[in-house]
């Protein structure tokens, strides 16, 4: 995925014609607005020849005015892929469950996989490798941290979450990352100590 992203980034900056998604449609559900997410998905999909359709909070009352099952079936009939930026993580799970087309998790309150893919891509670009990176995240133990922990179950790293004691990440996600025995995971409440443990510092 990272190699493909690097190749596409090069083609984009060189203004090369790349119409892989010609005659394809992306439905973008934004229950939670974001300028960066909208601009990146919409620009990228249209550059690759597709059409991106924006649906804001007032267009769909997902899980309220509109049943998620019905919305999922509607998009599956008219579109080729869905990107959803939602609050409730269960909603993205249900959306994918009833969908017959790919569903991209643009963000939920639980995790933010696209952000972490971008972060690890940036690390790879600047450092030339993602082999055992030493990373410290400073901030609340939020959806960003949960996605880092999920990535730490797949590639080896030293990951430290430095957060206030009352704002720790989800205990179950921490334990799964530790139990995977792939990465070194630790939780710190001392910023000065934490920065000594890593080469890469991330904060919100």
Q: What are these regions, as identified by a protein language model?
A:
Residues 181-197:
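Short acidic low-complexity segments
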Residues 25, 30-77:
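Active-site cofactor/substrate anionic-group-binding motifs, chiefly glycine-
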Residues 198-204:
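Residue-level detector of conserved catalytic or cofactor/ligand-binding positions
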Residues 48, 98-100, 155, 181:
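Short, structured coil segments at secondary-structure junctions
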Residues 16-18, 73, 80-151, 200:
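Anion-binding alpha/beta catalytic cores of soluble intermediary-metabolism enzymes, centered on
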Residues 1-39:
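Positively charged, low-complexity intrinsically disordered leader regions
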Residues 155-178:
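NAD(P)-binding Rossmann-fold cofactor-contacting core
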């Amino acid at each position: 995925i990272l190699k493909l992203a690097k190749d596409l980034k090069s083609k984009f900056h060189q203004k090369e014609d790349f119409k892989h998604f010609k005659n394809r449609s992306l439905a973008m559900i934004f229950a939670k607005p974001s300028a960066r997410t909208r601009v990146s998905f919409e620009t990228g999909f249209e550059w690759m020849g597709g059409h991106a359709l924006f649906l804001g909070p007032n267009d769909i009352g997902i899980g309220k005015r509109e049943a998620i099952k019905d919305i999922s079936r509607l998009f599956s009939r008219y579109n080729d892929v869905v990107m959803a930026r939602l609050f409730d993580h269960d909603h993205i799970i249900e959306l994918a469950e009833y969908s017959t087309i790919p569903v991209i998790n643009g963000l939920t309150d639980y995790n933010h996989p696209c952000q972490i893919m971008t972060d690890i891509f940036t690390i790879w670009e600047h450092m030339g490798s993602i082999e055992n990176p030493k990373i410290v995240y400073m901030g609340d133990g939020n959806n960003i941290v949960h996605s880092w922990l999920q990535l730490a179950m797949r590639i080896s790293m030293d990951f430290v979450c430095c957060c206030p004691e009352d704002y720790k990440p989800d205990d179950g996600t921490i334990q799964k990352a530790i139990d995977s025995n792939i990465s070194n995971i630790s939780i710190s409440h001392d910023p000065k100590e934490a920065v000594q443990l890593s080469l890469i510092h991330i904060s919100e």
